[in-house]
């Protein structure tokens, strides 16, 4: 009888673990109160957008370490500033369990284009319960931003450093609050704590009025004769579920929301899982090694330009995305905003803890209104998905994500008849819901370099001298048009094909 009980308990535990892998309880990161009149109200605020041309160069970012009257950081003020300065700013941070600092993360995703300097300010605000989240919203967190700004208004701060494009708006404010948040259930900080999230002040309800649909304004103040507005912010807990600084991945996730990116999960349902920072990839290695940006995310940030394939060709020597900005785009000709993006993901840098490695093929049906919607979690829903991965193992469950990269076993192709098939959401030129632009012979060699044949009549990579091609346009691997023939050795793109100049 005891053995039967043990087997029963084991099976129940197994079922529980399986369910947990698929349906980890999660709430959205954007939890203000949606409203229909948002489009009208937003006329006075910068519109939501993903990325922008100001995410390059050296940029200063203000980070506020907010201690509560009833809840302090693990160390005193000096120790806290020292610890978080290390987590945010140390270049090439290699102190276990960290795989790098926050600076390192974004420097790596941008291929060195985005060099962040985080300026830390320590403040003390009211008791934590004043700002607590409920199961429905984060409306109380607006008071945390208000109280933080009230303290900062008494300090000599050069706010112009945080207005990256000179429009009078502080691009975003990061708040790290003391203790745990409410996002870890029984392992969290309890009822009177804050759910880590990102939002805008002007999307918060004005709780001082009796009108349930009266929304507040952002915070505007004067500094050194200039008027600045703080609207976009994110708030993240100091301590993670394990009691350490495993909130690192959550910081990268919420900060990326500030850049305009949505969640790719829907409540408990995940769609790209550990392969993407904006799904469950922020929790890779318990949050210390969040997944790197996908090629699509880097493209939106203007850190990468995918190469569109139109004619039959053979692509070889594709480096890991974490090392070089090389990715390929295959478009639905009859619906240009639907496309596949092919990228090589290897266990390098912040991709070290991905569930697998190989060629990942994203299927993206891009709709800017969904990506930038105030109504969070609209990109992927149970009835419609706009950002997914073709699973090479033909298994969409997140627990099977280790087999999503190509090649998988004997499956090294994505065609109209493969499993999975090269499906579309919108009809192609032949009236079908199939791409009809097959990828064959997908492979990764012992050096981690990927290759594939695009369409059946593929052309091998050419090795040429400078004089072979003269009048055609040359592009580098970032998609930049060269003024003429390249003057140095390397790999270039000519007429949609990779060309090696020796």
Residue ranges and their predicted role:
Residues 23-35, 40, 74-112, 117, ...:
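Non-catalytic C-terminal accessory/binding modules of secreted extracellular proteins
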């Amino acid at each position: 009888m005891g053995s039967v009980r043990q087997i029963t308990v084991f099976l129940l535990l197994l079922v529980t673990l399986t369910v947990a892998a698929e349906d980890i309880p999660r709430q959205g990161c954007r939890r203000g109160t949606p409203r229909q009149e948002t489009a009208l109200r937003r006329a006075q605020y910068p519109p939501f957008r993903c990325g922008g041309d100001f995410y390059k160069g050296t940029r200063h970012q203000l980070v506020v370490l907010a201690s509560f009257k009833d809840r302090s950081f693990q160390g005193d003020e000096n120790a806290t500033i020292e610890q978080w300065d290390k987590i945010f700013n140390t270049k090439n941070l290699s102190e276990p369990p960290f795989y790098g600092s926050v600076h390192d993360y974004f420097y790596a995703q941008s291929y060195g284009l985005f060099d962040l300097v985080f300026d830390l300010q320590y403040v003390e605000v009211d008791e934590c319960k004043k700002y607590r989240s409920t199961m429905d919203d984060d409306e109380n967190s607006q008071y945390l931003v208000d109280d933080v700004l009230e303290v900062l208004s008494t300090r000599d701060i050069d706010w112009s450093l945080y207005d990256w494009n000179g429009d009078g708006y502080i691009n975003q404010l990061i708040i790290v609050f003391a203790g745990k948040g409410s996002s870890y259930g029984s392992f969290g900080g309890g009822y009177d704590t804050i759910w880590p999230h990102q939002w805008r002040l002007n999307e918060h309800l004005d709780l001082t009025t009796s009108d349930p649909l009266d929304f507040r304004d952002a915070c505007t103040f004067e500094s050194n004769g200039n008027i600045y507005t703080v609207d976009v912010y994110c708030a993240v807990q100091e301590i993670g579920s394990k009691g350490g600084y495993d909130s690192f991945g959550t910081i990268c996730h919420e900060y990326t929301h500030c850049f305009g990116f949505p969640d790719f999960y829907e409540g408990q349902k995940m769609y790209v899982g550990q392969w993407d920072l904006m799904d469950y990839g922020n929790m890779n290695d318990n949050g210390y090694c969040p997944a790197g940006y996908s090629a699509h995310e880097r493209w939106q940030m203007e850190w990468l330009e995918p190469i569109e394939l139109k004619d039959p060709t053979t692509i070889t020597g594709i480096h890991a995305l974490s090392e070089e900005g090389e990715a390929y785009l295959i478009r639905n000709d009859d619906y240009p905003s639907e496309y596949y993006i092919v990228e090589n993901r290897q266990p390098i840098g912040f991709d070290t803890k991905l569930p697998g490695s190989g060629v990942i093929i994203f299927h993206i049906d891009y709709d800017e209104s969904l990506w930038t919607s105030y109504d969070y979690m609209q990109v992927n829903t149970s009835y419609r998905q706009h950002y997914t991965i073709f699973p090479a193992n033909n298994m969409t469950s997140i627990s099977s994500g280790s087999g999503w990269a190509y090649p998988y076993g004997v499956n090294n192709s994505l065609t109209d008849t493969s499993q999975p098939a090269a499906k579309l959401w919108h009809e192609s030129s032949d009236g079908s819901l199939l791409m009809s632009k097959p990828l064959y012979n997908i492979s990764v060699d012992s050096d981690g370099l990927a290759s594939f044949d695009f369409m059946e009549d593929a052309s091998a990579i050419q090795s040429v001298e400078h004089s072979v091609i003269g009048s055609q346009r040359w592009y580098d691997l970032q998609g930049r048009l060269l003024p003429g023939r390249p003057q140095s050795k390397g790999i270039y793109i000519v007429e949609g094909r990779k060309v090696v100049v020796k």
